[in-house]
Every structure is written in structure tokens, then in C-alpha cells.
Design a protein with these regions (language model features):
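Generic alpha-helical structural signal
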Residues: 7, 24-25, 79, 343
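Sequence signature of WD/YWTD-type beta-propeller architectures
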Residues: 35-367
Length: 367
């Protein structure tokens, strides 16, 4: 009897432990379902561009801006070009062989462009922020030793980053402060969080409440994508929602986000901006390239149906003004297919779609 009782007791103890561990596992799964990022199954990805006719580019009504390093009147320099979505009708908007213009961003109404200009040589070079009309006329300098500007959703303000050093640097994260420029008053207002530094690739959410940016080695972050309160000091790491990488961009309706997860992967996800901090759902890879190449600089089309990005050899520099021979502008329809819309490889990077104010194919901006 003693031996029988001992075996039974041992069996009950083991069964109890098994039940206990099973309950812990179930509770963990429930917690994961509610608290962890929801990652969808991957769509079928192609590691090389598809033939151009696989996406009907001609039906896309929006133009695209991009930076490119090429010959201008017998001199190699960076210029800002505009093209149709199918790659036709290339127009040089800047045409300044003695300056370098880069990082174009179209205003929400499609009438203006903000960008950066490098002037000078060597370490005496200075990067400044400008804006101009979409046809290249009436250029206005708004900040010296500044970089990576973006528009407010109403097109009345431009956010930009101050340079970290007085001496010129090509590092994208060489930034020290976020500043808001009011186009009506001409005033420069520092962001409430004055500790922001080493952030780059900023974008302003359509509801006007958030900035999204990448950070490198700043504010106790290594590499991350951050959500920053536009009118407060709060900073939230999007990694808790499965967002890792750099250079985020939001759709015009504020419902989706895209970013580069690695040098070879681009992602999209649903985003909820209604709460006290943004939440990300349904993370999905949409582009993956060969390890010998890179994909960078994502930008949603105004109707949210396409994403433009840069693609080229891994030896190219993805930073603003970084030489990237062989790089071209590409477009994906979010189905896994992507095509090149430029083919000359003239260091073509940083694409940005130009909205059409009268277009009825996408929702109006939030009021």
C-alpha cells in the first residue's frame, strides 16, 4: 500500500505540474494575442524587379520627385527631378550646377517643395533647408545648418532638424533639435522636447498629433523608429509593436505606415492614432531584394495604393547626398510586385509623390 500510494502521489504531482504549465502557456498565448504585434503571413515576394508591364503605371495620376546626381551643364551635381509615375517626362526642377539640391518633399496640396541645399566645398560646406514652388521658381531659404524637412498636414508649417555640428557632416543622424517653421509668420519654434537628437527621416502624422522618425544612438536608443508627441514631450518606441528599422512614412489618411526593416526588406502595417500612443497591427513585408542590393526611402502615394522607394547595389550610400551609382526609383503596388521607373542609375534616391489637389481618388485630409 505504501508503494502504491507513493506512485499515485507522484503521478498526481506530475499531472498537477503539467496542468499548471499548460495554464501558464494558455495565459501567455492570450497575453500575446492582445499585447504583442500582430504579424500577418508574408505575401509572395520577388527579390528582383518585375517587368514594367506588370504594374499599370500609366494609370497612376501622380508625379514623383527624387534627388539625382548627374551632369548639369557639363558639371556633376545633385539636382531635384520630377517624373511621371511611369518614368516619363523627366524635368530638372533646380538646374543649379554650382549647388547640390536633395531630399525633396512635396507640400500636401502639391504646389510647393521643401528640400535641402549643400553649398560650399569640403568641411566648409553648409546644408540648409529651402522651399520653392513645384515648378522650381521662388526659392526661399528658411534655415542654415539644417536638414531633412517635412510639411505639416495643412501645408502651413515646415518641420526640420538642426545640424548637430557646425562643421559639415553627411551622417543622416547628425541632428540636435526639432524645429517648426511657420510660413505665415516666419517664426522658428523649437519642439517642446528639447532633448530630441540623432533623429532623422521625420514625418508629420495627418492628424497633426505625432512626428514619426528614426533614431540612431540618441536618447538611450540604438536604432529604432519613434513616435514623438507633436505638442508634448512623450516619445514611444515602436518596436513593441513589431516595428524595427528606419525611415517611416504614413499614408495620407493616417491609417497605414511603411518603413525599411533592413537594407533588404520594406514593410507596411496598419496604424491606430486614436489613443494616447500609436498602435501598430498587421505588420507585413512587401518588398525583399537580394543581399547584393539595398532598398530604402519609402513613400506612400497620395491614394495609398502604391509605395515608391530607392533600389540599387549594396555599395551605394543611402544617406542624403551619399553617392549611389546604379540606384533607381521603383514603385510597388503592395502585392509583392515592384518595378523600376528609372533605369539610368544616376544615384536616384529619396522619391516623394506629388499630390493632386483636385484628385478625388483619395480621402481628404483630417480636419
Amino acid at each position: 500500500m505504501t508503494r502504491y500510494y507513493s506512485i499515485t502521489k507522484s503521478w498526481l504531482q506530475e499531472a498537477g505540474i503539467t496542468v499548471f504549465l499548460s495554464l501558464l502557456l494558455i495565459l501567455g498565448m492570450i497575453d500575446d494575442a492582445f499585447c504583442e504585434p500582430q504579424i500577418q503571413n508574408e505575401i509572395r515576394l520577388k527579390k528582383m524587379p518585375s517587368p514594367r508591364d506588370e504594374i499599370n503605371l500609366e494609370k497612376i495620376p501622380f508625379k514623383i520627385l527624387f534627388e539625382t546626381f548627374r551632369d548639369t551643364n557639363g558639371r556633376l551635381n545633385w539636382e531635384i527631378y520630377q517624373i511621371n509615375a511611369d518614368g516619363s517626362n523627366q524635368v530638372n526642377l533646380t538646374q543649379t550646377p554650382d549647388l547640390d539640391e536633395m531630399y525633396p518633399h512635396a507640400s500636401p496640396d502639391g504646389t510647393k517643395v521643401c528640400f535641402v541645399v549643400d553649398q560650399g566645398k569640403g568641411r566648409t560646406k553648409v546644408r540648409s533647408v529651402y522651399y520653392m514652388n513645384i515648378d522650381g521658381t521662388e526659392r526661399v531659404k528658411i534655415a542654415i545648418n539644417a536638414r531633412q524637412p517635412c510639411w505639416s498636414p495643412d501645408g502651413k508649417k515646415i518641420a526640420y532638424l538642426r545640424g548637430e555640428y557646425e562643421r559639415y557632416s553627411t551622417r543622416e543622424y547628425a541632428t540636435s533639435e526639432l524645429v517648426i517653421y511657420d510660413m505665415q509668420t516666419g517664426r522658428h519654434k523649437p519642439h517642446p522636447n528639447t532633448s530630441l537628437h540623432h533623429i532623422y527621416a521625420i514625418c508629420w502624422s495627418p492628424d497633426r498629433n505625432w512626428f514619426f522618425a528614426a533614431v540612431h544612438g540618441g536618447m538611450e536608443f540604438s536604432d529604432a523608429i519613434l513616435a514623438i508627441e507633436a505638442n508634448g514631450t512623450g516619445v514611444f518606441d515602436m518596436e513593441r509593436w513589431g516595428v524595427r528599422g528606419c525611415r517611416p512614412d504614413l499614408s495620407r489618411d493616417g491609417k497605414r505606415m511603411t518603413w525599411g526593416e533592413t537594407d533588404w526588406d520594406l514593410c507596411v502595417a496598419d496604424i491606430d492614432l486614436s489613443g494616447p500612443e500609436p498602435k501598430i497591427y498587421n505588420v507585413q513585408k512587401i518588398v525583399r531584394c537580394l543581399l547584393a542590393a539595398k532598398v530604402y526611402h519609402v513613400d506612400f502615394s497620395p491614394d495609398g495604393k502604391y509605395i515608391a522607394f530607392s533600389f540599387g547595389p549594396a555599395s551605394g550610400g543611402q544617406q542624403v547626398g551619399g553617392k549611389a551609382s546604379g540606384w533607381n526609383i521603383c514603385v510597388t503596388d503592395l502585392s509583392g510586385k515592384w518595378v523600376k521607373i528609372t533605369t539610368d542609375g544616376n544615384h536616384n534616391k529619396e522619391p516623394d509623390w506629388v499630390p493632386i489637389l483636385s484628385a478625388e481618388s483619395y480621402e481628404k485630409e483630417p480636419q
